[in-house]
């Protein structure tokens, strides 16, 4: 069982256009809306592939019915009722793949809401992983994910995918796994990371601060996994990119589904490929065609330039 925690869920609207004209009228070719949020996306990807999961999330009363209708029983949820409305995130996707995102802040959580979410997450039985994902809404303390990690009972590993101060706090709280992207990793260590060796050294630095393993999403350069005893890099060259929204969530879901260690890196990248070949936030099932281009390097090339 993998429990996800999404403190700031969203309704994700994806609008496809030919080309964005700032200040002009833009006509959509296609528009979709999905119940989302990073942890919800992870749970949906896991459930699609037969992995037991429960998504813990605050459910704002004013838009709860819309969110549940869009979710359509895709995953079991443990909802914490709160006041307000669920935020809407808009992704504008141009024909050449350019993505422009507009994200609302989300409803304000009270301290009681925060406590209720943490209690709900720790109350799901038989969980091997508890996965905290996404931005923090107004009212949530910066140590929200650190508190989530501190509450983990023996036998439950905690993975965190967030950014900024909240991610730094989770590192110091001893999370079993953190999943930054390259920009987030640079922010955590306070310097630019231009090569794969730079990224690996930064990951080692975070492990020295307290977390046990680091999974770095590198965009077109694939993904890097580092723990105290292993280091590996996986990549794939593909041309048919439909949408990069949700690719990092799929990467994390695939990694955890494959066991949450170095041996799962190839699967993680394959799941990410399936996501970027899928329109909208929700990924389709992984196929042999998604696995075929994945190359796993057990020994990394430290001189390799990133952002290729």
Q: Which residues does each PLM region occupy?
A:
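Short acidic, glycine-rich surface-loop motifs adjacent to enzyme active sites
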Residues: 124-137
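Conserved post-catalytic alpha-helical subdomain immediately downstream of the catalytic base
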Residues: 205, 209-212, 220, 231, ...
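General beta-strand structural signal in soluble alpha/beta enzymes
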Residues: 4-7, 57, 78-79, 131-132, ...
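Conserved phosphate-binding/catalytic loop of the ribokinase/pfkB sugar-kinase fold
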Residues: 91-127
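Positively charged, low-complexity intrinsically disordered leader regions
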Residues: 1-23
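Substrate-binding N-lobe of the ribokinase-like
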Residues: 27-86
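Conserved phosphate/ATP/ADP-binding segment of small-molecule kinases
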Residues: 143-158, 162-229
């Amino acid at each position: 069982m993998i429990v996800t925690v999404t403190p700031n869920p969203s309704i994700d609207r994806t609008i496809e256009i030919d080309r964005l004209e700032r200040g002009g009228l833009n006509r959509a070719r296609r528009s979709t809306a999905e119940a989302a949020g990073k942890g919800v996306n992870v749970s949906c990807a896991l459930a699609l592939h037969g992995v037991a999961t429960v998504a813990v999330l605050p459910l704002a009363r004013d838009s709860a019915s819309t969110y549940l209708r869009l979710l359509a029983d895709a995953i079991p949820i443990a909802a914490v009722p709160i006041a307000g409305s669920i935020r809407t995130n808009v992704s504008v996707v141009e024909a050449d793949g350019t993505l422009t995102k507009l994200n609302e802040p989300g409803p304000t959580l009270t301290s009681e809401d925060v406590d209720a979410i943490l209690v709900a997450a720790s109350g799901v039985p038989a969980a091997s992983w508890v996965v905290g994902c996404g931005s923090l809404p107004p009212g949530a303390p910066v140590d929200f994910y650190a508190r989530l990690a501190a509450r983990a009972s023996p036998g439950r590993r905690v993975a965190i995918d967030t950014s900024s101060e909240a991610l730094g706090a989770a590192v110091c709280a001893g999370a079993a796994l953190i999943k930054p992207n390259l920009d987030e990793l640079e922010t955590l260590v306070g310097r630019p990371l231009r090569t794969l060796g730079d990224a690996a050294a930064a990951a080692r630095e975070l492990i020295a601060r307290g977390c046990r393993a680091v999974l770095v999403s590198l965009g077109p350069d694939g993904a890097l996994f580092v723990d105290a005893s292993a280091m590996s890099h996986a990549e794939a060259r593909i041309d048919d990119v439909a949408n990069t929204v949700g690719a990092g969530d799929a990467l994390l879901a695939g990694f955890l589904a494959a066991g949450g260690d170095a041996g799962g890196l190839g699967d993680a990248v394959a799941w990410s490929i399936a996501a970027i070949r899928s329109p909208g936030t929700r990924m389709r099932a992984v196929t042999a065609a998604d696995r075929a281009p994945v190359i796993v390097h057990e020994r990394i090339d430290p001189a390799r330039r990133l952002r290729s």
